Swiss-Prot record:
Disulfide bridge positions per record: none
Lineage of the organism: Bacteria, Pseudomonadati, Pseudomonadota, Gammaproteobacteria, Enterobacterales
Organism: Escherichia coli O1:K1 / APEC
GO MF annotations, alphabetized: xenobiotic transmembrane transporter activity
Keywords of this entry: Cell inner membrane, Cell membrane, Membrane, Transmembrane, Transmembrane helix, Transport
Protein name: Multidrug resistance protein MdtB
Length: 1040
């Protein structure tokens, strides 16, 4: 019969050791809660950390960029600028379109921001042009966020106008109603319309003007209330034939009489069914199409939104004619799922490797089963907490769990190893479990809370980076806490039931061989440690050297922000000369498409020409290149981009700018390349002076590539210089001149055709086929006060000038954005420093301000806070350790292990050619928590030996190092193997995971080798310092 130890032994573990059924059921409950939580958790690429962003679009066909800025954008900006919680406001005013992007503070709910935007639009309504065809429309979407899904709609039998009409009414509206969808954009949208193309010569010959025609059309097509008749016995609603629905009806419209004979619209104009805007076009591969881009709302889950769309698509396509084909060209969730699947596989690999290393050290199947149960239980239990915290299964939380594999097994290893040591000494399993668990309990608590202390500063990181890593830090902390609970409850209980002297002594050939190997390693370590303790100052100099080396490596290592991911989608901008027309740009775009589609890595291509919410001018085109899956192509995205740019360089007259889409989008506007730098001034004249000078210098920097600017001030303008005196004598106002020009050349929307399903426009313009270019202005006629017809040329001169193709604002002031990429042999930190140095050489005036934007600005912010973040982690851990050990000295001994980890991590990153980015920095912070475990295990046992066995400090630390050598080696290798799958990852999203693994593996290897020798030396030096300090105080007291 087994004699139980006294009830004072076992500590907090005693209750669970003595009640195995209750402990087992408790663990089953944790397991079930975790499984249920896993099934309930949403899946995403990264934590949802989007800024609340709203885009406001206003269309005013025919308006110049200058008119759009002053008449539409500026009044709206003044109202938006008064909203609380607004972080940044940017706008782009181009020909016929104003796009304002409003980015709010992270703390402001999107719904609240939406209400403020609507109120601001309402307040600005009276300030906007009275002939604005439609009021401003807002969407809860970030325009820089790539579409979650792109669909192409084509037809072999129907014109694009009919296809667009069906897609808009039957498909796009339904998709827009799906939860999480922020905006559905129809690129190349050929909306049906009745186009009236006036024959200038015909109306002039009849003494008519375009304004006469416009007035006749608007008066003939109305749709207003008419009332009803309410008699004694019945009510009658009034109706009339006041609507004209077809081109034929408009063709027969009488617009005037001459000599008693009617003049019909068809006599002076070509009237046809056409497109509302003839300067829009989109293509899927080489076929003209309606391209439907679906963007999510900020904060919406991509996976669930895309799944809802795919579930609805079959039902929607069934309502379309058979000649209409809907093709899904890209779906970002495909790569997101693949990335998450790869990370989950790496998590399983980490668990398998950790269990393998445990068996290698323990050489005992029962002893291996215990942590083999504890590790998955700790990780699975974390899912239950993640549900309550509203987290998701994403790359960062899965990376946290993968790293946690090496952490959580440490607690189990420490407990098992200590209990096994007592069983091998002859203790009964139950007594050994109670004694071993009680002895190691404080160490487990110290390890747990000191490691969590390292993660605390991550929770206080500001802005979007802090939000991004909050889920990572909390997930890891929860896994560590659950591991500590499991290690103090389930693990000792299983040890008491599964371990025995017979099982621990049972050895096979492998066990005996490995035991001899470990004995030789420990003996060699003991001899080496004895020599090191005899030369403390030499060892201390090595420790100080690692500190100095870590600082030097930190200064010189290339620095970045976020790893560039290969998500299989490339966004592109095609740029042509500023005077390019729509037809010219469409032709150039098709030439480029032919080149791109020949690349073996390209699966499909969508392209768009025209002015809309993301494309500012007719001389640019927008591209989306969808690559084949990663396992079906030989090269990663950066090599594909380089190859495509080289191929397109052979196409004359165009510049192509490409960038891979990323899961993390911080920018608020679609840019040509990955990084942005802005110049802001109080006037456009100041920008026109300084932008070319800065561009010239930046294009010469080797640290930058693909440098471009959105400053386009060479757009051709035909300036109509009216002689106001002559016009006034004839009774012609400037409003008459503007109306005549707008009627002729503005694709003016003059009337609306109402149907049961949609509304369509009547478009008025001059037929300029026979009078191209500036000659068309000679055909303009105006009506004088006496009813005569006056040629525009008689009161005005035409001057050719240059003007901006688009006018951009940032927080209401003119701005230009310079975009750039970083070559492979340089880092983002190099590029940022080069730009800052170049800016200083220009001596910019005080009214010019510069600032990095988007991810570059976030990089600067993260880089500035990194050192403080690490310092905060060290201070937090010092405070926790000081509280736990009730000592000012021992925490310093433990923290002395940190420089070795930093040296190892930085060296590994440099050897691997990886930048010190945000992911790598998180790895270094985690190393701070890992490597101090070695010192904690040594110091705990040394202090116990001094206190309980009366050993000298040197004997105590020497014995502690030898006794704890095996668990130290086991825990370090477990942590290393937990990070190894991340370091070796090659699948989708590997770019995101690899820096974390590289830094941790490098840091663990170097720290493992050095801290086994430096920690005991520093422990003894601080012990001598403490004795010297005490003796000095004692001497002063005696003298007093």
């Amino acid at each position: 019969m087994q004699v139980l130890p006294p009830s004072s032994t076992g500590g907090p573990s005693r209750l669970f050791i003595m009640r195995p059924v209750a402990t087992t059921l408790l663990m089953v409950a944790i397991l079930l809660a975790g499984i249920i939580g896993y099934r309930a958790l949403p899946v995403s690429a990264l934590p949802e950390v989007d800024y609340p962003t709203i885009q406001v679009v206003t269309l005013y066909p025919g308006a110049s960029p200058d008119v759009m800025t002053s008449a539409v954008t500026a009044p709206l900006e003044r109202q938006f600028g008064q909203m609380s919680g607004l972080k940044q406001m940017s706008s782009q005013s181009s020909g016929g379109a104003s796009v304002i992007t409003l980015q709010f503070q992270l703390t402001l709910p999107l719904d609240v921001a939406e209400q403020e935007v609507q109120a601001a639009i309402n307040a600005a309504t009276n300030l906007l042009p009275s002939d604005l065809p439609n009021p401003p429309v807002y969407s809860k979407v970030n325009p820089a966020d790539p579409p979650i899904m792109t669909l192409a709609v084509t037809s072999t039998a129907m014109p694009m106008t009919q296809v667009e009409d069906m897609v808009e009414t039957r498909v796009a509206q339904k998709i827009s109603q799906i939860s999480g969808v922020g905006l559905v954009t129809l690129s190349g949208g050929q909306r049906p319309a009745v186009r009236v193309k006036l024959n200038a010569q015909a109306i002039a010959a009849l003494g008519l003007t375009s304004e006469t025609v416009r007035t006749a059309i608007t008066g003939a097509n109305v749709n207003s209330a008419k009332g009803s008749l309410d008699g004694p016995s019945r009510a009658v609603t009034l109706s009339a034939n006041d609507q004209m629905q077809s081109a034929e009806e408009y063709r027969q419209l009488i617009i005037a009489y001459q000599n008693g004979a009617p003049i019909r619209l068809g006599d002076v104009a070509t009237v046809e069914q056409g497109a509302e805007n003839s300067w829009l076009g989109a293509w899927a591969n080489k076929e003209q199409a309606i391209v439907m881009n679906v963007q999510r709302q900020p904060g919406a889950n991509i996976i669930s939104t895309a799944d809802s769309i795919r579930q609805m698509l079959p039902q929607l396509t069934e309502s379309l004619p058979k000649s209409v084909k809907v093709t899904v060209l890209s779906d970002r969730t495909t790569n997101i799922r693949a990335s998450v699947d790869d990370t989950q596989f790496e998590l399983m690999m980490a668990i398998a490797l950790v269990v393998m290393i445990i068996y290698l050290f323990l050489r005992n199947i029962p002893a291996t089963i215990i942590p083999g149960v504890a590790v998955p239980l700790s990780l699975i239990g974390t899912f239950a907490v993640m549900v309550f915290l509203d987290f998701s299964i994403n790359n960062l939380t899965l990376m946290a769990l993968t790293i946690a594999t090496g952490f959580v097994v440490d607690d189990a290893i420490v407990v098992i190893e200590n209990i096994s040591r007592y069983i091998e000494k002859g203790e009964k399993p139950l007594a050994a479990a109670l004694k071993g668990a009680g002895e190691i309990g404080f160490t487990i608590i110290s390890l747990t809370f000191s490691l969590i202390a390292v993660l605390i500063p991550l929770l206080f990181m500001g802005d979007i980076v802090g939000r991004l890593f909050r889920e990572f830090a909390i997930t890891l902390a929860v896994a560590i806490l659950i591991s500590a609970v499991v290690s103090l409850t389930l693990t000792p209980m299983m040890c008491a039931r599964m371990l025995s002297q017979e099982s621990l002594r049972k050895q096979n050939r492998f066990s005996r061989a490995s035991e001899k190997m470990f004995d030789r390693i420990i003996a060699a370590y003991g001899r080496g440690l004895a020599k090191v303790l005899n030369h403390p100052w030499l060892t201390l100099s090595v420790a100080l050297s690692t500190l100095l080396l870590s600082v030097l490596l930190w200064v010189f290592i290339p620095k970045g922000f976020f790893p560039v991911q290969d998500n299989g989608i490339i966004q592109g901008t095609l740029q042509a000369p500023q005077s390019s027309s729509f037809a010219n740009m469409a032709q150039r775009q098709r030439q480029v498409a032919d080149v791109i589609l020949q690349d073996p890595a390209v699966q499909s291509l969508t392209s768009f020409v025209g002015v809309d919410g993301t494309n500012p001018s007719l001389n640019s085109a927008r591209l989306q290149i969808n690559l084949k899956p990663l396992d079906e192509r030989d090269d990663r995205v950066q090599k594909v981009i380089a190859r495509l740019q080289t191929a397109v360089d052979k196409v004359p007259g165009v510049d192509l700018f490409l960038q891979p889409t990323q899961d993390l989008t911080i920018d608020t506007q679609v840019s040509r390349t990955q990084y942005q730098f802005t110049l802001q001034a109080t006037s456009l004249d100041a920008l026109s002076t300084w932008v070319p000078q800065l561009m010239e210098k930046l294009q010469q920097l080797p640290q930058l590539s693909d440098v471009s600017s959105d400053w386009q001030d060479k757009g051709l303008v035909a300036y109509v210089n009216v002689d106001r005196d002559s016009a006034s004598r004839l009774g012609i106002s400037m409003a008459d001149v503007d109306n005549a020009l707008y009627n002729a050349f503005g694709q003016r929307l003059i009337s609306t055709i109402y149907t049961q399903a949609n509304q369509y426009r009547v478009v008025l313009e001059h037929n300029t086929e026979n009078t191209p270019g500036l000659a068309a202005l000679d055909t303009i006629r105006l009506t004088s006060s006496d009813g005569g017809v006056v040629p525009l040329s008689s009161i005005a001169k035409i001057e050719q000038r240059f003007a901006p193709l688009s006018i951009n604002h940032l927080d209401q002031f003119p701005v230009t954005t310079i975009s750039f990429n970083v070559p492979d042999n340089y880092s983002l930190g190099d590029a940022v420093q080069a730009i800052m140095d170049t800016e200083k050489t220009l001596n910019l005036p005080v009214d010019i301000t510069t600032q990095f934007q988007g991810s570059t600005l976030a990089f600067q912010s993260a880089l500035g806070s990194t050192v403080w973040l690490i310092v905060a982690a060290v201070v937090a851990m010092y405070i926790v350790l000081g509280i736990l050990y009730e000592s000012f000295i021992h925490p310093i001994t433990i923290l002395s292990t940190l420089p070795t980890a930093g040296v190892g991590a930085l060296l590994a990153l440099m050897i691997a050619g990886s930048e010190l980015d945000v992911i790598a920095i998180i790895g270094i912070i985690l190393l701070i928590g890992i490597v101090k475990k070695n010192a904690i295990m040594m110091i705990d046992f040394a202090l116990a030996a001094e206190r309980e066995q009366g050993m000298s400090p040197r004997e105590a630390i020497y014995q502690a190092c030898l006794l704890r050598f095996r668990p130290i080696l086991m825990t370090t290798l477990a942590a290393l193997l937990g990070a190894l799958p991340l370091m070796l990852s090659t699948g989708v999203g590997a770019e995101l995971r690899r820096p974390l693994g590289i830094g941790m593996v490098g840091g663990l290897i170097v720290s493992q080798v050095l801290t086994l020798f430096t920690t005991p030396v520093i422990y003894l030096l601080f012990d001598r310092l403490a004795l010297w300090t005490k003796s000095r105080f004692a001497r002063h007291e005696e003298e007093a």
